[in-house]
Amino acid sequence: QAIGQFCAEHDIQAVVVSGDLTQRARLREFYACKQFLDSLNLPYLVVPGNHDIPLYALWRRVFTPFYGYQLFFGSLERDLETEDFYILGVNSIRRRYHTKGHISLEQIERIDQKLQAAPSNKYKILLAHQPFYIPAHQYGQKDCPMLAKIALQRWSQNGLNAILHGHLHQSAVDDLNQVYDLKVKQPILAVQAGTAISHRLHAGRPNSFNTIHLDGQVKHYYFDTVLQCFR
C-alpha cells in the first residue's frame, strides 16, 4: 500500500524491478508479484534474479528454470521506453550458478546495437540483477559478471547513463566511469536497490527503493514504520 500511495502522489514514468521477485520461485509468489505490479497502473519492466529460479527442485532448475517467471512475465529480456527514459533489460541469471551473474558476448552485442539505435535525447538505462561493480568491502564481490568491464567499455561509447541492479539488498550509487576509468564524458551510474516489500530484510535495513531522475539524480526512500510510508 505504501508503494502504491507513493506512485499515486508522484509523477512516475515507469517502475523497474531488478530481480528477486520471489523467495523460492513458487507460482503463487510470481502471481502475487504480478498482481502487485499491475495494481500500480504504471508501465513496468522486470528481470529475473537468482531467487526466481528453483533452488532445491533440481529437475526444474535444470530443464525449466524460468518456467514460473515466463508464465507471468513473458520474455526474459524486454525493453521499455517512456517519455524520457530508454530502459533495456538483460538476464544475468544462469541455472549453473547459485548467485554469480553472467552475461554473454551475444548479450553485449545486442545491448550495444540497441543503444546505438536509441533516441539521443533519452536517458539510457540497463536493468540487470547482479551488479557490475561491488566495492571490495562488500559481500558478494564474486557475483559480478565476468565480462562486466568489457561490456561497459562497449556500452559507454554509445551513451549508456546508468545500470540499475539488485542482488545485494542495499541502496547505493557508484559512478562506473570513474571505477573502471572508461574515459567517457557522461557519468555511468550503478544504482543499487534495497529490498522493497519483502519481510525478509537484510542486516536490519528497512524496506527501501530508489527513484532516478532525468538529470541523473538518485534518491533513496526508506520505509518509516511509524508513519507507514516511504520517505
What does each of the following model-derived ranges do?
Residues 213-231:
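A short C-terminal boundary segment appended to hydrolase-like catalytic domains
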Residues 20-21, 93-105, 133-142:
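Surface-exposed cleft-lining segments at the edges of enzyme active sites
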Residues 1-32, 38:
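N-terminal active-site segment of His-dependent metallophosphoesterases
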Residues 140-215:
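Conserved beta-sheet core of the metallophosphoesterase superfamily
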Residues 120-137:
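Short acidic, glycine-rich surface-loop motifs adjacent to enzyme active sites
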Residues 23-28, 50-58, 95-98, 131-135, ...:
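Active-site environment of divalent metal-dependent phosphoester hydrolases
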Residues 14-20, 44-50, 91, 125-128, ...:
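Active-site neighborhood of phospho(di)ester-bond hydrolases with catalytic His/Asp-centered motifs
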Residues 31-110, 118, 154-156, 187, ...:
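Extended active-site neighborhood of metal-dependent phosphoesterases/phosphodiesterases
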